[in-house]
Amino acid sequence: EALNYFFKLDFIESNCVKAWRGIGWCSFISLKYEQAMKYYEKIIEHKPLAIDYMNAGHVAWVMGNIQKAAVLYGKAITACGTRERFLEMFHKDEEPLLKQGIREEDIPLMLDLL
């Protein structure tokens, strides 16, 4: 239902980054990874925030593209200003990552890559 709301908002308001963020996240948790990545890439081309890079990293990771995920997470760290702020943000998303099939033991390994 939320996904439909964000699609309507995107239709009404062109280049609505807020709608794209909603579509990206709702698509991610709905297992629509290609759609999620499409919207995160649009955001990154326009006005990305640290969370946009991080969420795009999540999508890349669950799609099996570890290298792309690491690059996007690196950009998120830069946008956050500090690794600590990134980690705080990242740890809030551990549950959704686990629900998407990321193994708990792989999380520290990914963070070590960064």
Q: What name fits each language-model region?
A:
Residues 80-114:
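Terminal, low-structured helical/coil segments at or just beyond the last alpha-helical repeat
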